[in-house]
Swiss-Prot record:
Organism taxonomic ancestry: Archaea, Methanobacteriati, Methanobacteriota, Stenosarchaea group, Methanomicrobia
Primary role: Component of the A-type ATP synthase that produces ATP from ADP in the presence of a proton gradient across the membrane.
Name the UniProt record assigns to this protein: A-type ATP synthase subunit E 2
Family per similarity comment: Belongs to the V-ATPase E subunit family.
HAMAP family membership: ATP_synth_E_arch
Bilayer topology: Peripheral membrane protein
MF term (GO), any: ATP binding
Compartment annotation: Cell membrane
Gene3D superfamilies to which the protein is assigned, alphabetical: ATP synthase, E subunit, C-terminal, F1F0 ATP synthase subunit B, membrane domain
Length: 197
């Protein structure tokens, strides 16, 4: 009987040990599952946070690109308005030679060229259509210089030093270009009522 009791005792101890191992295993499994769930939640939260950041960045990028496109289109419209304004201005002054005030304007333009080339031997470059007016202005002012009828312009003239190093452009076209280059902002303000329209 002692042998049977011993076997029962061993079996009972083995059963208890088995139950204890199973309980420990269940606790470990539960702990692992809780940890996995916590990690999964953290990973999910990180993924959501990254997705939110990515969406915000993409949204901001798209807004920036849209604003840039709007600015580009506004700039193109402004440039077209400026181009149109200068084209109309050029058309309006294209018949200036027939205006009674042209000789006085031509005299002023000639004096500006002469002044810009002061101290130099001067060559005036004129449109053949202005040869009479130019001769009259030079006689009136007493200025002596060479004249070359070698440019085509809607009005005005240019001049160079005899050696060609110094040039003074005073055609109406060159004056319009200078105005265009230096006064674009003012022109935009006049056309649109401000730099931002």
């Amino acid at each position: 009987m002692a042998y049977e009791d011993l076997i029962k005792s061993i079996e009972s101890a083995a059963e208890e040990k088995k139950q204890e191992v199973l309980r420990n295993a269940e606790r470990e499994v539960e702990a692992i599952l809780r940890e996995a769930e916590t990690e999964s939640s953290a990973i999910h939260a990180q993924y959501l946070e990254k997705a939110k950041r990515d969406l915000i960045l993409e949204n901001n990028r798209q807004k920036f690109l849209a604003k840039q496109e709007v600015k580009k289109r506004i700039s193109a419209v402004r440039q077209k308005l400026i181009d149109d304004a200068f084209s109309r201005s050029k058309e309006k002054i294209s018949g200036i030679r027939s205006d009674p005030s042209y000789p006085a304007l031509y005299e002023r333009l000639t004096r500006e060229v002469i002044s810009a080339l002061a101290g130099e031997e001067i060559i005036l470059h004129i449109d053949p259509a202005d040869s009479k007016i130019c001769s009259d202005v030079l006689k009136k002012t007493g200025i002596v210089c060479d004249i070359m009828q070698d440019i085509t312009t809607i009005g005005g003239l240019s001049g160079t030093s005899a050696d060609g190093r110094i040039r003074a452009y005073n055609t109406l076209e060159s004056r319009m270009e200078r105005i265009r280059d230096t006064s674009t902002l003012e022109i935009i303000n006049l056309i649109l009522g401000g730099p931002d329209g």
